[in-house]
C-alpha cells in the first residue's frame, strides 16, 4: 500500500475510507425522495472471524442505504433502510427501525425526534449519521421547486413570500448580513454594532 503525500512534514498511510453519496428525486406522485448510501472500506486485508469471512482490500465493512420520501411540508411518508454489508449479522436486525419516522416532520427538532424514535441501542450509529446528509440533500432537492428549469437557485423561495428555512442558519445567511439584505430584504435586520 503506497504512502500518501506528506502533510506538514509527516508521511501518512491511508487506513480507512468512508464514502457517502446522496441523490434526491421528485416522484411522479408528488413526493420528494432521497436515497443515501454509506460505504466504509479499508485498503488492507482484514482477517476472518466467527462473524464473517476475510475481507480483501476495498471490500465494504459497511454498505448501508436509506430512503426517505417526504411531501412539500417535509412530512415523512416512507422510510426504509437496507444493509448489504455489516460487520455483524445482528446489525441487519435494525433495518426496519426507520419506519418509526413515518408521520414525523423534518425541521426544527428533527435530531431530537431521531434520538427519541431510534435511540442508541435499538438503532445503528451509522444509519443515524446518514440521516444528516440525507436530510440536507432533501432540502437541496426541493430548493428549486417542482419546475426548476431556467430558474436561479432562490427564485422559488423569493416568490413564495415565506421566510426560507436557511435564513439564520449560517454566516452568509445571517439576518444582519449582506446576502439576506440583497436577496430577502423583508427578513433582514440591521447589522449589530461592532466594538
Name every feature range the model reports, one short phrase each.
Residues 1-45:
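Short, Gly/Pro- and small/polar-rich lid/capping loops
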Residues 24-26, 40-195:
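Active-site- and interface-proximal helix/loop "cap" or "latch" segments in soluble metabolic
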